[in-house]
Amino acid sequence: MLLWPAPAKLNLFLHIIGRREDGYHLLQTAFQFVDYCDWLEFRPSADGRIEHLSPLPGVPVEHDLVYRAALLLQQRTACSQGVEVRIRKHLPMGGGLGGGSSDAATTLVALNHLWETGLSISQLAQLGLELGADVPVFIYGRAAWAEGVGEQLQPLELPEPWYLIVTPAVQVSTREVFIAPELTRDCKPMTISGLLAGEGENVCEPVVRGLYPVVADALDWLSQFSPARMTGTGSSIFAAFDGKSQALAALACMPSHWQGIVAKGCNYSLLLDCLEKTGC
């Protein structure tokens, strides 16, 4: 049995540089993966039924991104096969680590292989974009500079530090953050060279600090050890360390009511490694 990884991502910075006519925010960000994942198991079937055996509590199956990804691939390729899907869920919900998008991307990539539907990675990414702006970066599996609504991607080679990722016990509403009047929406455009020089910030962070004091507390705590930043709209935050031992030492001091993990930054996701092992 092969388990397929759905890795977490970090937004190393997040700027908003404007808005489109349809109201969507124009973003700049940089994605890097870590070696911490959900794990998905797929059992193809001949009956054409898509069965999600690990549904998320309170989420109707037709709204679940894994189910929607499988159905989308099945319909667009006129595939007659079905599948049973199980998920070993590790990534927190509403944490800004991309768990739902990553699960959807892994579903598209894995079923394209198992069902032998023959789509290219770029074709899968186009399908993924229909499910969410973050899905394509997980399909390509490369650390990337992103613009537009997050779908315009340019591969990046970045340092791969150890991270301590802390998730307070709260789910942040992305909608609440993006409609906040105090959110900065006119950042000066960033450059890749600026990112590599350490420039950039997460402009959602001040808004989330005000709305969710527990996230502010976590940021202040983690900043004692290394500069801390929020990923996406939170609630997860992270800090980089030169070595695993330093990250583990900070984790040992973390308040017990938060969730913390130590993970390695990866410019190539574990999903790419898995795909290579299948011979694709």
UniProtKB/Swiss-Prot annotation:
GO terms for biological process: isopentenyl diphosphate biosynthetic process, methylerythritol 4-phosphate pathway; terpenoid biosynthetic process. This is 4-diphosphocytidyl-2-C-methyl-D-erythritol kinase. ATP binds at residues 92-102. Its EC number is 2.7.1.148. Coiled coil: none annotated. One of its GO terms (molecular function) is 4-(cytidine 5'-diphospho)-2-C-methyl-D-erythritol kinase activity. It catalyses: 4-CDP-2-C-methyl-D-erythritol + ATP = 4-CDP-2-C-methyl-D-erythritol 2-phosphate + ADP + H(+). The keyword Kinase applies. Catalyzes the phosphorylation of the position 2 hydroxy group of 4-diphosphocytidyl-2C-methyl-D-erythritol. The active site is at residues 9, 134. Pfam families: GHMP_kinases_C, GHMP_kinases_N. It comes from Nitrosococcus oceani (strain ATCC 19707 / BCRC 17464 / JCM 30415 / NCIMB 11848 / C-107). Pathway: Isoprenoid biosynthesis; isopentenyl diphosphate biosynthesis via DXP pathway; isopentenyl diphosphate from 1-deoxy-D-xylulose 5-phosphate: step 3/6. Keywords: ATP-binding, Isoprene biosynthesis, Kinase, Nucleotide-binding, Transferase. The keyword DNA repair does not apply. Belongs to the GHMP kinase family. IspE subfamily.
